[in-house]
Amino acid sequence: MFRRPALQVLRQFVRHESEIASSLVLERSLNRVQLLGRVGQDPVMRQVEGKNPVTIFSLATNEMWRSGDNETYQMGDVSQKTTWHRISVFRPGLRDVAYQYVKKGSRIYVEGKVDYGEYMDKNNVRRQATTIIADNIVFLSDQTKEKA
């Protein structure tokens, strides 16, 4: 029942070259991130010479859990961990909308991919940076309306 649709989906992701030419299999991979959280700072737009501008902001996601064994789990202490993510928006239309409407404290949903890059800081030291390249942003709250 589910076998045929699964095979059709897999065929979209795996491409085979001719068996005569080569036995090399070219396969697609997936780099996808979904985040739901609150904006930590108003976005900034930066432009490096010779490159397209980028809108950058931080997004906080929270993870909560209860500590304790099975008997006291319901009564255990609640612990929380906040993880901060650097969000970069390069797509021209989305970049401008994010710069204009994303505000500190807003609750948003971001879809994108993880990117690990390197850059030289102002002291000429090579640094590594992890960022989420946003493909889609969904605004779930307007911070100005929440304060009213």
UniProtKB/Swiss-Prot annotation:
N6-acetyllysine: residues bearing it: K113
Metal-binding recorded as keyword: no
Subcellular location: Mitochondrion; Mitochondrion matrix, Mitochondrion nucleoid
Quaternary assembly: Homotetramer. Interacts with MPG/AAG, through inhibition of its glycosylase activity it potentially prevents formation of DNA breaks in ssDNA, ensuring that base removal primarily occurs in dsDNA. Interacts with POLDIP2. Interacts with PRIMPOL.
Pfam family, one: SSB
Annotated transit peptide: 1-16
UniProt GO cellular component terms: mitochondrial nucleoid; mitochondrion
Span of domain SSB: 30-141
Organism: Oryctolagus cuniculus (Rabbit)
Modified residues (N6-succinyllysine): K122
Biological process (GO), any one: positive regulation of mitochondrial DNA replication
NCBIfam families in the cross-refs: ssb
Phosphoserine carried by residues: S67, S79
Primary location recorded for the protein, binned into one broad class: mitochondrion
Protein name, per record: Single-stranded DNA-binding protein, mitochondrial
Superkingdom in the source lineage: Eukaryota
Alphabetical list of InterPro entries matching this protein: NA-bd_OB-fold, Primosome_PriB/ssb, ssDNA-bd
Name of encoding gene: SSBP1
Alphabetic keyword roster: Acetylation, DNA replication, DNA-binding, Mitochondrion, Mitochondrion nucleoid, Phosphoprotein, Transit peptide
GO molecular function, one term: single-stranded DNA binding
PROSITE patterns associated with the record: SSB
Purpose: Binds preferentially and cooperatively to pyrimidine rich single-stranded DNA (ss-DNA). In vitro, required to maintain the copy number of mitochondrial DNA (mtDNA) and plays a crucial role during mtDNA replication by stimulating the activity of the replisome components POLG and TWNK at the replication fork. Promotes the activity of the gamma complex polymerase POLG, largely by organizing the template DNA and eliminating secondary structures to favor ss-DNA conformations that facilitate POLG activity. In addition it is able to promote the 5'-3' unwinding activity of the mtDNA helicase TWNK.
